[in-house]
Amino acid sequence: MAGPLDALDDPDYPAYTTGRAAEVLGVRQAFLRALDAGGAVRPQRTAGGRRRYSRRQLALAARARELVDQGHPVAAAQRILALEDDLAAERALTARLRRQHAGPGGRGS
């Protein structure tokens, strides 16, 4: 039986307000709004339109902050995040296809 706190274990649960997310990451709220506007980190919205961030989104925002701290403009950091996401998806697809090709015996033909 799922309890009311189980959602907090979900990395996609939108538990953080913009202010709290900014505080946790050590960034300004404007930085998070810029990531949202650029499409790099799209928080969920409440019925009233307020942003709510998940732990997974905080990790993406932290990576964007790391890239900006390295000297990349925000737009470049957003593009890098998108490319890293694409690469991860392609790697997962490649791994799945290799497993399928290997078949039940673990060897390819």
Q: Where in the sequence are the language-model features?
A:
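Ser/Thr-centric signal marking residues that sit
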Residues: T17-T18, T46
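Residues within the helices of the helix-turn-helix
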Residues: T18-G19, R33
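Short coil turns linking two alpha-helices in DNA-binding domains
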Residues: R28-F31
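Arg/Lys-rich, alpha-helical DNA-contact motif
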Residues: A2-P14, E23, A37, R42-P43, ...
